[in-house]
């Protein structure tokens, strides 16, 4: 999770005017020249990170994240929930700007509720992934990289969605600064017959691997299990509870 400090002059802020950066209020307004200087000076950049994981199984999906928020070299929070329910049978992990992620989650919740009210049924995961990609592509949430997971009439789904709205359905996926460590665990242990309980253990191992090597990840794990029965999110401070 992070707060934005990079140059926004080539994105939506350019269309609104240089004096009104889209995400400025979260950290204070920066003049254009100051943003340029911060970008040019490596020491001026705020390094941030997280680790999020999504795993598909035959009976549902498992999504897991660490619980640390960082800002530069500082741990800004030790108890952050980075996975949220956005659909009666769907959840979203978040990596990126805090404000943009919160706004994206609120928008998705509102859209899925409106869809259900108008049509009398839940939005499919394919439609929800398209909606999420379109919102990111619009530019308003372009510093967020989520994982979307859920269950619908077609089965279980995990979608990797990049910051520009590109959407790919995967068997498993990871995001964040610790992703290279987590991905190695999933590559080694995943198989098509994995159960929900096995996926929970696998996700915990993946997050733990990232926490041991990535300074921006840590402080426990949030695990979301999504099945036909709904979304269940549980916090664990100790990895041993899952291993």
Curated annotation (Swiss-Prot):
Keywords, in A-Z order: Autocatalytic cleavage, Cytoplasm, Hydrolase, Protease, Proteasome, Threonine protease, Zymogen
Region (Disordered): 1-50
GO biological process, one term: proteasomal protein catabolic process
GO MF annotations in UniProt: threonine-type endopeptidase activity
InterPro entries named in the record: Ntn_hydrolases_N, Pept_T1A_Psome_bsu_arc, Pept_T1A_subB, Proteasome_sua/b, Proteasome_suB-type
Assembly notes: The 20S proteasome core is composed of 14 alpha and 14 beta subunits that assemble into four stacked heptameric rings, resulting in a barrel-shaped structure. The two inner rings, each composed of seven catalytic beta subunits, are sandwiched by two outer rings, each composed of seven alpha subunits. The catalytic chamber with the active sites is on the inside of the barrel. Has a gated structure, the ends of the cylinder being occluded by the N-termini of the alpha-subunits. Is capped at one or both ends by the proteasome regulatory ATPase, PAN.
Protein's recorded name: Proteasome subunit beta
Designated gene of the protein: psmB
